[in-house]
A protein has these predicted regions:
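N-terminal beta-strand-loop-alpha-helix module at the start
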Residues: 1-71
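Acidic-and-aromatic substrate-binding clefts and catalytic sites of carbohydrate-active enzymes
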Residues: 72-78
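Beta-rich, aromatic/charged-enriched effector core domains that present basic-aromatic interfaces
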Residues: 79-174
Length: 174
């Protein structure tokens, strides 16, 4: 069995997960550090956590194997990676799958965790973005002075977003 962890900002439609359904346990955890690292409005935290619970319930309803750690769990205040470590030990997991982690600090922390625990980590391109990291790095390597406007113009042209048939932008201006 493998583990697929889903972070709170990765509540993507089920079609992105279906191919992992049969051989993965899906792990989600409400995280104390995420709720407290910055002062957030209580309703924002409530919305965030209720969205996660709803997504986990949806996965369970669709016959996914889900392990979910709630705010009332004795593990709630433990570091997120301690929660992951607990499940990989109890389920004898050697391989983890996830979407790309957008938070660079947490991604680096997770890479170190994977290395330290001798795990295989399969990273999937995040459906959160139109462009892959490789495409963006390719753009940066080709432009001495990168500008987001130039990058997005190229992306619109490549993906034909808000473009007329003649190659000009809808509305006439970039």
């Amino acid at each position: 069995m493998k583990l697929f962890f889903i972070l709170g900002n990765q509540l993507f439609p089920i079609q992105h997960l279906n191919s992992f359904k049969d051989d993965h346990i899906f792990f989600m955890a409400e995280d104390y550090q995420l709720c407290t690292y910055e002062k957030h409005h209580k309703l924002k935290i409530l919305l965030f956590l209720s969205s996660m619970r709803s997504h986990a319930d949806y996965l369970k309803k669709n016959k996914f194997k889900v392990e979910y750690t709630k705010i009332d769990s004795s593990d709630f205040k433990k570091d997120y990676l301690e929660k992951v470590k607990k499940i990989i030990k109890s389920k004898k997991i050697k391989e983890i799958t996830s979407f790309e982690i957008e938070d660079k600090f947490f991604e680096k922390k997770f890479q170190n965790f994977v290395k330290k625990n001798d795990l295989i980590w399969n990273k999937i391109k995040s459906p959160m973005f139109l462009n892959s990291r490789e495409e963006f790095n390719d753009y940066l390597s080709k432009n001495k002075r990168p500008f987001m406007a130039t990058f997005y113009k190229g992306t619109r042209q490549k993906l034909n977003i808000l473009m007329k048939k003649d190659g000009n932008p809808e509305g006439g201006k970039w």
